Amino acid sequence: KDLLFLGTEFGLYASVDDGDKWSRFKGNIPKVAIREMVIHPREHDLIMGTHGRGIFIIDDITPLRSLSDSILDEELYFLPSRPYFISSMGGSQSFRGDDEFIGSNPRDAVYISYYMNKRHIFGDMYLEVYNEKGNLIAELPAGKRKGINREAWTPREKPPKVPSSNVLSSGALFGPTQLPGTYTVRVIKGDKSFDGNVEIKFDPTLPHSKKDREMQLTTLRKAYDMLENLAFLDAKIQNVMEQIKELEKDTSTIFRSASK
């Protein structure tokens, strides 16, 4: 409730203490006149009209809404973000109705947001993601700047190994999406660690039942495992074929030597 935005002739300003202190909001927002603003009721995006330079959108201001004076003193504090929804996409058109973005689409990723009261300079700093079983499933770089850092994690498993083929198919370029649930995110900052969490959910706008969605994910994982097993068998066959070729070369050499 203490978060305020102010559009001025020289860009966007924000306050997290009900207007006592103001700071210019940078984040790729230029010093242009902000004439009108609206917060999208579903996506929680801040949409700004400049009436000259176009429209600027700040995706998901949920992390900003949780900022307070006490948080600003924290060494590192995880900020809430909207859940990631598993959607059903097509090849070139996803048929998502008013969920379809016409401008530059936000990256299809889980956003991990955290605040730091000072820039991290010395020592390692990176992010780890753990599933509900406590298994490490992803590691990615972590933002080190003072203020709000927002990192994007693509919640997919690595692409499956596939058998060799002369035909190009894009179906195996991506791994399956991680299962719905709550995932632990951990920032390793020097010799310290800080934990937060993010959520992955089924898209509530889709008509499919939870049972159907779970069946789809189970089938995808079975296909993933089958591809990996097939790739393993293919590699063994290719190895045997190479050995046969080498033996044929050796046998041919022996026959030629014996016939002299």
Predicted regions and their residues:
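Extracytoplasmic/secretory ectodomains and luminal regions
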Residues: 68-260
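Beta-propeller blade termini and top-face loops
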Residues: 1-101, 107-110, 115
